[in-house]
């Protein structure tokens, strides 16, 4: 059985929907180590997939203590509980750990330099969890998208802009992956078998997010003004480490095409 934290959230709800033999964890708000130990033990789960987090960068900057508890302390509680009961732990990290790297990328797992509190806490989480539980898997996830009205994401941003005919802004100088959430869920069975460590996790691209957006609009047959925004730091990952173990994603463009086909956009 797979116990999923954050089961009502953007990532968690899709894992609950598509993965076999899942259970939703109770809320982790204000938990203690003892509470987490009891939750894990009573779940009878073989695997814990931790998706719950405070992921808004601005929120983390405004309240670093809350960010630390949610993004570092709770994963450590889970790692201790899984270590004591010999369970596999999968934690979602972020491509933001590359947000201050000095070169342009694409970045491999060793070349990290966080540029904000959220990113720093995610990187600290990875290190502390792996110190406790070396078999744990850290997934450095990209900006994920899906047809999901409860949370803004790349797809909903584009569709809403088409509806309102507002312009969107993306930089022709920024390279980053974006990932179809369906493919995240489809890869979880292989993720569970990964050796412990950190993995770049998502779709790869050789085109800027500005180019990708224009191609996606062409694919949809829609007209929209795409402004070329000022250059932003790349979040451009090399995902070959996970791919060696069979974790496969469509390219960014192919993923968007698949998503459009799935939802008949």
Task: Place the predicted regions along the sequence by residue.
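C-terminal amphipathic/interface module of NAD(P)-dependent oxidoreductases
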Residues: 222-225, 229-265
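Rossmann-fold cofactor-recognition segment
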Residues: 23-34
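NAD(P)H-binding glycine-rich loop region in Rossmannoid oxidoreductase-like domains
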Residues: 32-70, 81-83
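NAD(P)-dependent short-chain dehydrogenase/reductase
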Residues: 127-176, 183
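N-terminal Rossmann NAD(P)H-binding glycine-rich loop of SDR-like oxidoreductase domains
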Residues: 1-19
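Catalytic helix-loop patch of NAD(P)-dependent Rossmann-fold dehydrogenases
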Residues: 69, 73-77, 97-139, 145
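SDR active-site strand-loop-helix element
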Residues: 5, 48-52, 89-95, 139-141
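Mid/C-terminal beta-alpha module of Rossmann-like enzyme folds, strongest
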Residues: 187-188, 193-234, 238-239
């Amino acid at each position: 059985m797979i116990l999923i934290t954050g089961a009502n959230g953007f990532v968690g709800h899709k894992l609950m929907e598509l993965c076999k033999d899942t259970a939703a964890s109770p809320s982790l708000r204000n938990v203690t180590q003892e509470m987490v130990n009891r939750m894990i033990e009573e779940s009878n789960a073989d695997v814990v997939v931790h998706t719950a987090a405070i992921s808004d960068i601005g929120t983390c900057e405004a309240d670093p203590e809350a960010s630390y508890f949610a993004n570092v302390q709770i994963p450590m509680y889970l790692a201790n509980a899984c270590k004591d009961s010999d369970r596999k732990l999968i934690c979602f990290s972020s491509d933001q750990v590359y947000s201050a790297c000095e070169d342009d990328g694409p970045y491999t797992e060793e070349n990290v330099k966080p540029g904000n509190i959220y990113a720093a806490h995610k990187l600290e989480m990875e290190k502390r969890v792996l110190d406790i539980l070396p078999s744990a898997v850290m997934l450095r996830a990209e900006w994920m998208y899906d047809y999901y009205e409860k949370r803004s994401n790349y797809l909903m941003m584009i569709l809403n802009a088409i509806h309102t005919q507002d312009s969107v802004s993306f930089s022709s100088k920024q390279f980053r992956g974006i990932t179809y959430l369906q493919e995240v869920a489809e890869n979880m069975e292989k993720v569970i078998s990964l050796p412990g460590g950190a993995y770049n996790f998502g779709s790869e691209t050789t085109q800027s997010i500005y180019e990708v957006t224009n191609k996606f609009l062409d694919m949809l047959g829609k007209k929209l003004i795409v402004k070329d925004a000022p250059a932003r730091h790349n979040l451009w990952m090399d995902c070959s480490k996970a791919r060696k173990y069979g974790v496969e994603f469509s390219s960014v463009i192919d993923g968007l095409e698949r998503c459009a086909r799935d939802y008949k956009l």
